[in-house]
A protein has these predicted regions:
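Residues that define the transmembrane beta-barrel architecture of outer-membrane proteins
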Residues: 39, 69-75, 113-119, 164-170, ...
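Residues on the lipid-exposed face of transmembrane beta-strands in outer-membrane beta-barrel proteins
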Residues: 45, 75-81, 121-127, 140-144, ...
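Transmembrane beta-strands of outer-membrane beta-barrel proteins
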Residues: 41-47, 96-100, 119, 134-142, ...
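Transmembrane beta-strands of outer-membrane beta-barrel pores
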Residues: 47-53, 81-83, 102-108, 142-150, ...
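Cleavable N-terminal export/targeting peptides
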Residues: 1-37
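Short glycine/proline- and aromatic-enriched beta-strand/turn motifs that initiate or cap beta-hairpins
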Residues: 22-70, 74-82
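Extracellular loop and loop/strand-boundary signature of outer-membrane beta-barrel proteins
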Residues: 61-65, 107-110, 156-162, 198-202
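Short loop/turn motifs that connect adjacent beta-strands in outer-membrane beta-barrel proteins
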Residues: 24-40, 84-96, 111, 128-136, ...
Length: 203
């Protein structure tokens, strides 16, 4: 059987990053005013409903429930940093940020598949500006996912798609980014997610 767990097509992504200045709660001093801001910190929340590429009969009804399933949902909490606008990297890459994310995934069949949690690094960058506050962006994620329920002859015999409890997590997304306020933005787009154990173990 195939070594990959599932391939997901995310239909929408909602992100609310909020830059936080490290000295915003302090009274400005001459030194702080003169010193360039090295990093801008961001917090993000992504909600991604999606659909599975049903490449195995397990998704088409050959499972314990005897029902087809293909809907997915993931929720991600992200921390990112961006180089300050007065730094060399900030001037060269003004619309790029990177960080770490934690994602919860459900395939609405936790009894046989599990509800994996992904821990990953990511980078988000602009492709092109479409308007003053609207741009076309991309993002990639790479990490590990935990909490799968793999094939077991006794307890999980129908699951022919999950071979490992831990699998790689890979995502690539294309999205529109709308900066509707100085410290807030909203993104929506499509993404492709792949879970894999690299053929290290088969059901």
């Amino acid at each position: 059987s195939a070594s990959f767990v599932a391939v997901l097509l995310c239909l929408t992504v909602v992100s609310l990053p909020a830059p936080v200045r490290g000295e915003s709660l302090r009274r400005p001093t001459p030194d702080s005013l003169a010193r360039p801001q090295a990093l801008v910190h961001k917090l993000g929340l992504d909600v991604s409903p999606g659909a599975l590429f049903r490449t195995d009969d397990f998704f088409k009804g050959a499972n314990a429930a005897g029902k087809e399933f293909g809907a997915t949902l993931s929720v991600h909490l992200k921390y990112a940093f961006q180089f300050g606008p007065e730094t060399r990297f900030g001037r060269n890459y003004p619309f790029t940020y990177q960080g770490v994310g934690l994602g919860y995934n459900t395939f609405f069949n936790s009894a046989e598949v599990g509800t994996p949690v992904a821990l990953y690094v990511f980078q988000h960058a602009r492709i092109a500006a479409l308007a003053e506050r609207l741009s076309l962006d991309y993002e990639w994620n790479f990490g590990l996912s935990f909490g799968w329920k793999p094939f077991d002859e006794q307890t999980n015999p129908f699951n022919t798609v999950v071979g490992s409890k831990i699998n790689a997590y890979i995502n690539l997304g294309l999205m529109l980014n709308w900066r509707f306020a100085p410290r807030w933005s909203l993104t929506a787009g499509v993404g492709l997610t792949h879970f894999s154990n690299g053929n290290t173990r088969y059901p």
